[in-house]
Structures are given as C-alpha cells and as structure tokens.
C-alpha cells in the first residue's frame, strides 16, 4: 500500500533506543500538607490521607518555566560531562505558557551559544500533562528515522502547577525533568508497545489567557483519567499479546508481567486507585480467575460488573484497593517519593516517578525488568507504554551511572526549606498579581534557591525576561558551566541575537556574581 513500509525493517533501527540519562529539579521550598490542613481549616487528613500528599513544593516569583528548564538542562549536561555539540534535538513539553508565541526551547538555546551549535531540531509540545510524553515519543521517533544524524535528543518536561484558593490548591507542585535520549540506552523503549487513547472532554483546561489557574471539573477529571487507563491498558495488552503470538507464545498478559508500574500522579491516592483499576481489568478479562484464594480471593460478587459503571462505585473501589495492596507496595509505592514530597509537577510528574524508582533500587534489582508508564493529560490524551531495563548492571555500566546520578534524590528533598502556610499563601498571591506583568523586578530573595539554580532577574517594559544563575560553591567563573567539554562536531559559531539585548546585572550583593541571560528580542 502506498505510504506503508514492510514490517521487517527492524534491522534498520538503532539498537536499544531509550533514556540514557535523567535529571530532576524541584523548588528549594515546600509547604507541609499537615500544616496546610490546619491553615485551611479542613479536617485533619484531608490532604495527607485523602490525597496521599505530605509536602508540596512551590516557586517564588524568582522562578518561572524558563528558569526551571534552564536549571534542569544545565544540571543534566554538567552532571554527565556532556558537550552541547552532541545534542541534535531539543524538545520541551509544558503547559505553563508565559508567551503565546516564543517557545521555552528557544530560551534554552542560550545554553548552546558557547558551543556554536544551532543545528538543533524540536520545539515545544503542549497538551496538559501529556506534553512531556509527546516530546519524548518525538525524540524516540527522530532517532529511529532517516532524519537522525547520530546525536542525542534532549527532552525537557517542566511545569508550575498552581491553583486558586480552595480544594484544588493542595494538589499543586512544580518541577522539571530532563532526559537524554539515544541508542544503547539502559532504559529501552519497547518498540510497538504503546496503548494510546485520545478523546475530547472539558475535564481540566485553561481558557483564561491572563491567569495561571485552570478550570477543573473534579469528578469528570477522575472519570476521564480512569477511563483512559482502562482503554490504554486494553490496547497495550492486545499489542503485546500479538507480539508474543508471533514469537510462539500464546498466553494472556497480566500485571504480573510488569516488574514495576508508574503513573502520572496528580496526587498519590489516585495512583493507588489506578493500580486497583488495572487489577479490576485483569479480573474481568479472565473468566477463569480463581476467587477462592489468591489475589482475586473474595471478589466473585464483582464478576459481572461493567468497567464503565464502576468509576465511582465505592464497593468495587474498596474491594480492589484491598486486593491490590501488595501489588501496589511491590510495584508502585517507591515511585511516589517525589509526588508525595513535592506534589504534582504536571508534565514531569510521571518522569519524577521514574526518577524516584531509579533512586531507590539497585542496578541489580532493576536489571531486566519491564516498567509500565501511564501518562495522562487532560482534555484528554493518554498512553500506557513500557520500558525494558537493560540486563547489564555491572559497575560503570549505563544503568549503574543513571541510578548513581539519582542516588542523592532523597537527600535533596530533605534539604529543602519548610515554609509556613501563611507565607506560602502570600507567595501565591504575589504570583497571581505579578506573573503577567512587564517592567517587573521579582521581590523574593535568591538566597533560598539551590546552588546552580537559574532565576528571573527582571522583566523589562517589552516583557523580555532576563535570567541569572545562582553560583555553585567551589566553581570557577560561571561561564565554565556551559563550556564545551567534549567537542565532537566543528560548527561555525553564529552569534545569538540574544546577545544584542543588554545584560542586566544582579542588583544586590545577595544575588552573587552571575552571568545573566535574556530571552532576546520578542
């Protein structure tokens, strides 16, 4: 058929395409959810038990989506001693829009200036919390295409999740994840194993162009999330079953075939319910499921329920959450470290879960495992796909390196500063009043930011934003942070138009000696 390709093109693809390195960034301050319950005057446990959240990271007016992404990209490049020359594609997934035309990706290109590398494909991708996954799939597809030039792809997912005062506010958060994508990766995307579901709904959306706050239909949002999970899992199971049949194995796929399961996490309790939901899918698809004992023990009464009738059935939910408790503890709970401690990061949420998993298990434990990832973005778009971890867990291996790079994750979370709820509320008020302003100088201090964090210096009268980086103790001049470490491709250096914009130096001693960068002429 015209436009189609033969199936036997496997030998043409690069080997083991996937995630080579991963970096995560979250704000240096948080509000305690127990204290927030008291401050908001709600019942004890509403946020901590009902939502499953312990702490919520948040940004001051010193950080925006550009600064979050600048920080996480430079940290990934520095930690892995990478040259900016080795990046051939850079794509950003975000729903935090501060400019309706200029992309975050173009702001990040300032980090590439010293290398002279401007031959970098990709742009921003947006659909609620799904944008990071779409960007990641685009990167995988680029490497497996005729357009690939042998260099890495860099995928960035970042967001600032804020809500108006009320029930939704404790489900906020902020952060960014950067992923280096290439061949011979330790985290390999299983080709052909994606179950996707796309549908129209007004479950969560942001129609007000001057507000950061969404319009949310809470009940519909939960139904959309769970129905998408049902559909994606069904499509995924059909695809892997078809693959197995071609390989001579004819059996059904169940959750036991996943070593770990991670999910987009608006809040941790929904993830726990999602594991229960998948077990319900397994139960209903197996007409011979043993209910006298085992994981399905005592569930015979639910044999004839219909999935579409059970989204808000408390009896079904309670029974399957109990039945799936051990499954959740073994395969999912560890992945919720960042979600529980930092909140919902929107596009990077599911990849924060991946980072949490990698940070808490040894390479030997992870080797050879199949990890399922469920990504969901309101509106709505969802995919369930799987990653196969390499078998090579030897010291110095790619798997050893990626887990070692995340070994300080819990310590970084513990090093953050706890902020009182009233100060948090004041920060939210400042953001609401100033996030869209021109000719604005941020009010909050940079002293509480982590070392190496990029921050907003000012917004000029034309809405052009200027950034600086908080120095890293022990480093030399800040310019060294973006120098070429391992130049591999010779480029003609093309001066960036951003350099024509006057640099705005730090105005106070507390801001330190920094190199400021601007997003240039709009």
Curated annotation (Swiss-Prot):
UniProt-recorded name of the protein: Hydroxymethylglutaryl-CoA synthase, cytoplasmic
A molecular function GO annotation: hydroxymethylglutaryl-CoA synthase activity
Amino acids binding (3S)-3-hydroxy-3-methylglutaryl-CoA: 43-44, 129, 167, 171, 221, 264, 273, 344, 378
UniProt subunit comment: Homodimer.
Statement: the UniProt record of this protein carries the keyword Disulfide bond: no
Protein's gene: HMGCS1
Effect of mutating residue 69 to A: Does not significantly affect biophysicochemical properties
Function: Catalyzes the condensation of acetyl-CoA with acetoacetyl-CoA to form HMG-CoA, which is converted by HMG-CoA reductase (HMGCR) into mevalonate, a precursor for cholesterol synthesis.
Source taxonomy: Eukaryota, Metazoa, Chordata, Craniata, Vertebrata
Active site positions, chain numbering: 95, 129, 264
């Amino acid at each position: 058929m015209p436009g189609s390709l033969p199936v036997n093109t496997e030998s043409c693809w690069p080997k083991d395409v996937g995630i080579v390195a991963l970096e995560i960034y979250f704000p240096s301050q948080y509000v305690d959810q127990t204290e927030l319950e008291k401050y908001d005057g709600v019942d004890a446990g509403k946020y901590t038990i009902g939502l499953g959240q312990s702490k919520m990271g948040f940004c001051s007016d010193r950080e925006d989506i550009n600064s979050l992404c600048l920080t996480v990209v430079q940290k990934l490049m520095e930690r892995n001693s990478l040259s900016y020359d080795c990046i051939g594609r850079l794509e950003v997934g975000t729903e935090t829009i501060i400019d309706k035309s200029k992309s975050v990706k173009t702001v990040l290109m300032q980090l590439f200036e010293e290398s002279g590398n401007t031959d970098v494909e990709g742009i921003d991708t947006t659909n609620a919390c799904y944008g990071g996954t779409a960007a990641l799939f685009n990167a995988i597809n680029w490497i497996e295409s005729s357009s690939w030039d042998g260099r890495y792809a860099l995928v960035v997912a970042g967001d600032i999740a804020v809500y108006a005062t009320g029930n939704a506010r404790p489900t906020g958060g902020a952060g960014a994840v950067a992923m280096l994508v290439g061949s011979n990766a330790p985290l390999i995307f299983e080709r052909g194993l994606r179950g996707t579901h796309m549908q129209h709904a007004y479950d969560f959306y942001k129609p007000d162009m001057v507000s950061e706050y969404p319009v949310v239909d809470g009940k519909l949002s939960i139904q959309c999330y769970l129905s998408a999970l049902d559909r994606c899992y069904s499509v995924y199971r059909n695809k892997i079953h078809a693959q197995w049949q071609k390989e001579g194995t004819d059996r059904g796929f169940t959750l036991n075939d996943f070593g770990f399961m991670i999910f987009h996490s608006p809040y941790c309790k929904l993830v726990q319910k999602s594991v229960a939901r998948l077990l319900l899918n397994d139960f209903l698809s197996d007409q011979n499921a043993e209910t006298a004992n085992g994981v399905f023990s005592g569930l015979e009464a639910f044999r004839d329920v219909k999935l579409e009738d059970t989204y808000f059935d408390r009896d079904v939910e309670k029974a399957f959450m109990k039945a799936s408790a051990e499954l959740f503890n073994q395969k999912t709970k560890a992945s919720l470290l960042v979600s529980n401690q930092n909140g919902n990061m929107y596009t990077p949420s599911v990849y924060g879960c991946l980072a949490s998993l990698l940070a808490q298990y040894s390479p030997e434990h992870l080797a050879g495992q199949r990890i399922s990832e469920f990504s969901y973005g309101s509106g709505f778009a969802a995919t369930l796909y799987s990653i196969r971890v390499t078998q090579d867990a030897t010291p110095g291996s790619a798997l050893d390196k990626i887990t070692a790079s995340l070994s300080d994750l819990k310590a970084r979370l513990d090093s953050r500063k706890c902020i009182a709820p009233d100060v948090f509320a004041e920060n939210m008020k400042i953001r609401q009043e100033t996030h869209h302003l021109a000719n604005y100088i941020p009010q909050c201090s940079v002293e509480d930011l982590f070392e190496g964090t990029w921050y907003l210096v000012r917004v000029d009268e034309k809405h052009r934003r200027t950034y600086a980086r908080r120095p890293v103790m022990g480093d030399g001049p800040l310019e060294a942070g973006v120098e070429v470490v391992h130049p591999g491709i010779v480029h003609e250096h093309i001066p960036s138009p951003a350099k024509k914009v006057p640099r705005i130096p730090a105005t106070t001693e507390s801001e330190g000696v920094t190199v400021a960068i601007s997003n240039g002429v709009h």
